[in-house]
Structures are given as C-alpha cells and as structure tokens.
Amino acid sequence: MILDPLSPNIENHTQDEIIEFWEKTESIANIPKENLDESHVNSSLVAYLKFATDSYKVFINTDRDLYRMSLILLESSLFEFKKEFCLSKLQSLLNIDLLEMNMKFIIVYILLCEAKKNVYSLEIMLKFQGFTVFYNTLYTQFAYLSKYGKERTVASKHQYNSNNSSTGTSLDSLDRSLTDIDLGIIDEMKQISTVLMDLLFQIMKYCKCVIANLQIVDDFFVYYMMESMRSDTMDDMFNNAEFKLLLALNEQYMMFAKEYDIENKVYKYLINGSVSRCFTELLLLKFNRASDPPLQIMMCKIIYLILTPRGDYSPMNFFYTNDLRVLIDVLIRELQNISEDEEVLRNTLLRVLIPLLKNTQLSKTHYRKDDLNKLLNYLSTLDNICVDSPALHEHQVTVALSRKCLQQIPWLETPSTPSDGGSSVSSNNTSRNSSIVALGTPDNQNILARKGHLYSNRELDVSAESLTKRKAKAPPPPPPPPPSRKCGTPK
C-alpha cells in the first residue's frame, strides 16, 4: 500500500459530498472532443492535477481513492486522444524543482498507473527523456533522505527491535531532533521515491535501455540504495522498491558489459560487505520465497556475480555456511519443480549452481552430494525434461549445463559418455534416440558461447576494488541534489 491505512482522515464527509467530489473530478477530465486542441488539453490537465492535489488527504485518503483518481484521468477523452502530449506535460512538470510535493506524488502515481496499464506508454515516456526525468527527480529525494532521513530509519529499525525486546529507548527519543513537519516531509519523499523506483524498474524490465541511461547513474545513487537497505522487513514498500531497482540496474550493467567497458556500480558496492550486508540478507530471504520468474532470474544474476572470482575478490567466504546450504536447498527445490515452459529459469538456476559448488565452502563440505548427483544426472537426459513436447534450444541448454556441472565439480559423479563418442541432439525433434548431450561437441559449445548468452564476455573485468581495500575507506559522502532546473508553478 502506498498510503498508510492507519492515518486518520483530515476531514469527514457525507455521502453526498463524496459523490459530488467524484462527479466534479470526472467533469474536469472529460472535456468535449471539439476542445481537444493542445491549449484546452493543457489547461484541463493542469486543472485536474491541481484539483486532485488539493483533494489529497481530504477526499483522497486511501489507495483505492488514489487509484480511482488516476483511472478517471487515464480513461478520459482528455488523455486517450492526446496521450503523448499528456505524458510529456506530466514529465515536464516533474522537472520543476519547487513543484508542490503532493502534486509531484500525484503525477508520478498517475504515470506509474499508466505504465502498468499500458506497457507501450513506457516507450512514449522514454521518447520524452523519461529515464532522465525520473532519475533526476529520484536523485533529489535520495539526496535529501540521505541527509535527514537517516535518523528516521534508525528509529524505525529500533521500533522493530523494541517490539521484540523488553528494554530500549523509545521511538520518540530517537526522533527528538526531527519535528513533526520534518518527519512528514521524509515520509512524503519516501512515498514519491517508492513510485519513482517502481517506474524505473518497469522501464528496465520492459524497455530497451540505452547506454546513455546507465551513464548518468552515479555512485551515490547506487550507494544510497544499497546502504539504506533493511533486512528486518519483507513488507516495507520503499525497501522492496530499492531492492528491485538494484536487481534491474545490475541486469542492465551485465547486458551492456557485453559491448561496453562500463563499471558495474551495483557490483562495486555489493562486494563491500559493510555496505551490502542488509541487501545480501534480504536477497537470501527473497530468493527462498520468490515466485515471479523474471525477479528470480534477476536475483540469480546478482548471485552469480557474487559467486564469480574477479581480480582480488574471492567469493569463498562471502556467505556463511548455513546461507550456502539454504541456497543449495532452494536451487534443488526450484530445479525439480520448474515446468517445461519455464526452462529459461532452469537454465539460469543451473548457471548459478556451478560457481556455487565450485567457488565456495561447499567445495569442501559436499552438502547434499547424493541429491545433486541424482538431480543433475536426471537433467542430463533430454527425454526426462521434455517428455510431451519437442526439444527446444532451452532444453538442450539444460542438458548441456547439467553435464557441465557434473564434469566441472570434482566431487560429483561424471556422467557417462554415449558410446558413439558424444553425439549431439538431433535437429529432428521427432527422433531423439541419443538422449544425453555431450559437451565436447562443437554444437553444444555453441549453445553455451552463443552471442547474447547471459554470462558471455566473462573476460571483461569489472572495475571494482577488493573488499579489504574498500573497508579501509570511508563511504563516499552524499552529493548535493542535481543543479536546480527552471523553477515555477505549472501553467
């Protein structure tokens, strides 16, 4: 929920007043078709935003009210016939630094609703520099929160801990240096930030970003999200939005690393245990409970980075032994339960399994050796994983990766080699007499080295300092907000 359901309404209204409010809201948005020129659309859109802003926390008090307000605009003739103009206008208003906080929130919420209602609208937003607008607006919130929101975060963490203990300082004493107005501003900024982070996540999930988007992301932006992460809650929307955006950013860095020598700023702070401790704890919790395949794949990619040695960094002692066992348990469970139509996810999980068994303490403890042998040998046979459907490229990759894992991990059983010397899977899907794929054949090497492979370009070293070196340095100070843009009120 974006709005706090426990916060009291500022005013109580009769049923007639509520009906009158929503009727007036609809009348502002639904202008006659003959008045759909840009001048009328502009004035009506601004009038709608002002009316919604003035009614926020007066008539608009719940998530349901907020969504209804957004939907009235998004389904109106005003928006449907002039969608590009409306989206560009909404984004231009966000560029006004001194725009009222509540109006900023209303605008970003409307944009997020439209993005989730119609993915194509994300492309329109990008056309009008949406990534830069959202990033700069979010950056400004982060710069303020890093300076004034730290005590509020400490207070929230203490409140959580005090609920589980009999002693401790009260929340009020931790918040004593912040006035009620300060706390209100911090909460409003977190609300706006939550929506903006979700918008950026949607862009990275569904749209093709360009390298210029990543180049404007600086160290402070990534550092703030990583350092302010909490692992004591799974339900905090701000925290969850930070987590998802870091996953999406990391995925973008990995994709662009195939073509560009670009520093992965997520990885840079990820291997610094003093900064990423809470993020890593939350990662393990969410990886164990995740049910959304795209999010699972994003988590796999970041776990893969952690488990891969680079430069001075070694993953051998990054995770505790119990955490490693949890990872193995989750991987075995997921690999067994994945349906045939989610074979890409199984491919990704297998790519994580290899460095997990090879580069961590599991290489010495041999945890669940028999279960791993049984599972990997089963997945090494093509007929086992696509019984009722034709063999696809993803099925062949599953077989190849399973055999690769058995061959590369010394303490696992090496799979038997077919008597014909290692023939590959026949291109004819109706004839699969050779059910085990041999990794030694050129065809199967191409499967793993194909252009666009998830972890191709492994030789490209990510520019990041070792954990030991970075621990000795103080974290970078938060920079000031971006240079002020043209200020004023919407016209």
Curated annotation (Swiss-Prot):
Gene Ontology MF annotations: Arp2/3 complex binding
Biased composition (Low complexity): 414-435
A single GO BP: endocytosis
Keywords associated with the record: Cytoplasm, Phosphoprotein
Chain positions covered by the region annotation Disordered: 413-491
Record InterPro entries: SPIN90/Ldb17, SPIN90/Ldb17_LRD
Pfam families, alphabetized: SPIN90_LRD
GO cellular component, one term: actin cortical patch
Similarity comment: Belongs to the LDB17 family.
Misc remark: Present with 329 molecules/cell in log phase SD medium.
Protein name, UniProt field: Protein LDB17
The species this protein was found in: Saccharomyces cerevisiae (strain ATCC 204508 / S288c) (Baker's yeast)
Species classification: Eukaryota, Fungi, Dikarya, Ascomycota, Saccharomycotina
Gene behind this protein: LDB17
